[in-house]
Amino acid sequence: MLVSSKSIAWLGAALIALAVVAAYSTGLRTPFQYDDLSTVVENDSIKHLSDLHLVLSPPPNVTPTSGRPVLNLSFAIDYALTGLNASGYHATNVALHLVAALLLFGIVRWTVRLPAVGLESPADFIAIATAAIWAVHPIQIGAVTYISGRSDVLMAVCYFAVLAAAIRALPFDAAQGRGSPHVSAWTVVALVACAIGMAVKESMVTAPVAVVLYDRAYVYDRFATALRERWRLYAALAATWAVVAVLLIDAPHSASAGFSAGISPWTYLLNQVLVIPEYIRLIVWPDDLLFAFGEARLLTLADVGAIGLVAPLLVVAAIWLWHRRPALGFPAVWVFLTLAPTSSIVPIATEAGAARRMYLPLAGIVVLFVVGIYRITQRRPRRRASSARPLSLAVAAVLIIVLAATTAAQNREFASPEGLWRASLERWPSRLAHRNLAAVLLQEGRRSEALEHLRAAADQGPLSRYALGVALFDDGRVGEAIVELQRAIDESPNEPTVALEGRRVLARALAQQQRHREAADVFAQVAALTPGDMAPRLSRADELRAAGDLPGAHEEYQRILAAQPDHSGAQTNDGLTLLRLGRVSEALPLLRSVAGREPRNTAAFMNLASAAAAAGRVDEAVGAVCHILADDPRNRSAQEFLADLRRAAAAARVRVADCPAR
C-alpha cells in the first residue's frame, strides 16, 4: 500500500518530536548553571511581565540578554509561568528546539525536491534524517539544556522561519513551475521573523545573506536574476539590520565583544583556528561533553602550528564547492556563514569558543552527510541497488539512536555543576573552567580546593585574579586579597566586573585594614562608575569620617542629601559628624528627621538623645530615651543613658520629667 507524502511528513514530524523528547528529557531537572544566574535568577527585569518597557529593556550588565529584548521577554514569560523553577525554562528550550528541528525538516524537504537537487523520491527520508540527527546531536546540549543557550535556539527558530518563508514566498513554485498565491503573506512572515530574530541575537545578521545564497543555489542560475526577481524581499530583510544597529547603540557589548573588547582581531582569529577543528571533532566523535572553551588566549602562529591550516582549508573547500556545484556548496557555505558572527575576526573576549555556536552551522554539515550517505548507497552494484534505501534507513536510524542516547547521558553530566566544570577542565583547560569550578567548591565550603583553582587561573586573566581576590577576602586573608584585587584592576581597568565589583571589594578590604583614606578614594571611583547609586558615596563619606576628615565627610553627606533629602544613612552619619564638629544645632534637625520617619529605630533615638543632651535640651533627650524604653523596657543602654541624664540634671539642679506610664 502506498503511503502519501503528506502522511510520511506527519510521521516524520512525530519521529523527530519523539527523538527530541528522548534525548533531552534527562536534562529537565538540571539546575541553573553559569550565566543562568544573571540571565534569570538575578535578572529583575524579567520579574514584572506587566511592565513591558522594563522587560524589553534588559539591563546592560546582564550579558546574555543585554540588547536582546525578545530573548529577555521569553524569560519573563517563563518567570510568570514557573517562577524560579528551572524545569520550566528547560521545557521551553526543548520546545523551541523542536520547533527549530521541524522548520529544518520542512526546509530540507522542500529543497531536495527542487530541480537543482533532483531528489524527489528520497526527499522525505533525507529531510527526516537530517532534522533528527541535527536535533539529537550531543553538541546541541550547550544550546538546549543550558538555559542561557536559548539565545541560539530562539535565534535559530527565527533564522529557519525566515528561510522557510522566503522559500514559500517564491513568485512561482520552483518544483512545479506554477505561480504561488501567497507571495505577499509569506514575504511578511519572512520580514517579521527576521526583525524578531535580530532582537534575539546579533548573529541573525547573516539571515538576509543566507536567503540570497539559497535562491542562487537552488532557484536562479545567476545572482543578477535573483536580484532582479526578488530585490524587494532582499531589501526588506536587509532593512532589519537597523534593529541590531539600534539595539547595539542602546546596549553596546564593547566590554565583552567587538574591536574594543581588549583582544586583537588577529589573536581572536588564531583562537578560532584552534577551536574550529575541535568543533569538528565533537561533531564527528561526540564522546565527551565540552561546554566552554574559556576566554581567548594570547597566541602566535607558532602556538597554532599545522592544525591552524584546517579551518582555512575548509573555508577554501566550501567556496570551491559553491563555485563547482552551488546546490552542494550552499550547505558548506552555510556552516561558515552562520558561524562567522562569533568565530571570525570580531573578538568576543569572554569566550574563545563554545559548542553551542555550532547550533545553526551543524545543519549544513548534517545535510551534506545525509545526502552523501544516500548517494553512496545508490552507487552500489545494480544487482544490489534494491537494498540501497533500506541500508540508508538503517544507517540513519542507528545513528539517531546512538546520538540520542549519548545526548541523554551527557545531559546527566551537565546536571552536576561540579561535574560540568571538572569535565571542561579535563578536556579543554581554561581559566574559565578553573574559576567556575572554584565558585562551585566555594559554595560547598571547600575553600582550600577552590583557592588552588583560583591561583591556577590568576595569571591567565583579570577576572580570575579578581575571583581569587574575592575568595581571599571572604576567607579573612585581607592583605593578600588587596594585592590580588589591585593587580586585577591594574591589568584590566575597563573590564566591567573587575572595574566595578573589584573596586567595591577592594574598598571594603582597605577599610578593614584601617586604611580609610585609601578606601575613600576607591569608593569615589566606584561612585563615578555608578552615578545613580548613593551607597558608594555614603561609604566614601564614612571612610573620610573614619580617617578624621570631618569637613570632607560632611561635604560628601551633603551631596547625597542634595540628591536624596530623606536618605536616612546620610542624615544619621552627617548628624553624628556635625556633633563631632561641635555644630550641634545643625545636627539636631537631621537626627530628628530620621527618628521621626523610623519610630522603631532604637539607634536613631539614641543618636537624637545624645544630640539633644549636647544641645542642653534635656527634656527632648529624655523624651527620646523614654521612647526607646516604652518599646523595650530592658534596654540597658537606654537605662544607663537616662540615669546619666538624671545625675547630670541633679548636679545642675534641673528637674527632669519622668517617662510617661505605659
Model-derived features with residue positions:
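C-terminal luminal/periplasmic domains and tails of membrane-associated envelope-modifying transferases
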Residues: 2-3, 382-387, 418-662
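Polytopic membrane enzymes that build or remodel cell-surface glycoconjugates and lipids
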Residues: 1-474, 535, 573
